[in-house]
Amino acid sequence: MKKILLIDDSDTYTWCLQKYLQHRGYPVKTASTLKEARAAIQEEMPLVVCCDLDLPDGSGMDFLDEVRAADKELPFILASCHDRDDYEQEAKRRGATLCMDKMKELLLQDKLVEYAYRQLSGEKAPTFHKLLFCPCRRYQRRSAAGGYAAKGL
């Protein structure tokens, strides 16, 4: 069965995401370097890729280019502690599905589950979208991460 591929050099961070996703019934493959990630993709194309922007042996942005050369539709989430404004436009241009702040782990977990479910059910996801935040409390709901998100997202 295809897996969610998590690529991050933080073992603790990867372990937490992996346990959450496995508990939800999704198989997970982890890699701490781009070399390991390339080997995992050679073995089997994943359901979803979630890749850190900065890895010991290269950039998640460059790995995005490699993945897009092989598969234009595969959901690819770039996750980083950096300010998204610094890399989001470039990631969008290169074909990233979503850019996420690693510190919003609960939201990232939910997005990974959403994209994995869409892949398994054959639903098409938008090629790129931003998470929208609504200033009017009338259209908001409290998120598990402590912020507000627009209803219906």
Question: Locations of the language-model features?
Answer:
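Conserved acidic carboxylate
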Residues: 8
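Two-component/phosphorelay signaling modules centered on CheY-like receiver
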Residues: 11-29
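Acidic catalytic/metal-coordinating carboxylates
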Residues: 32-33, 59-62
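Short amphipathic alpha-helix used as the core "switch/output" element in two-component signaling
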Residues: 39, 61-73
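Active-site beta3 strand of CheY-like receiver
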Residues: 44-50, 55
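Alpha4 helix (beta4-alpha4-beta5 surface) of REC/receiver domains from two-component response regulators
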Residues: 62, 82-110
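CheY-like receiver
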Residues: 111, 120-153
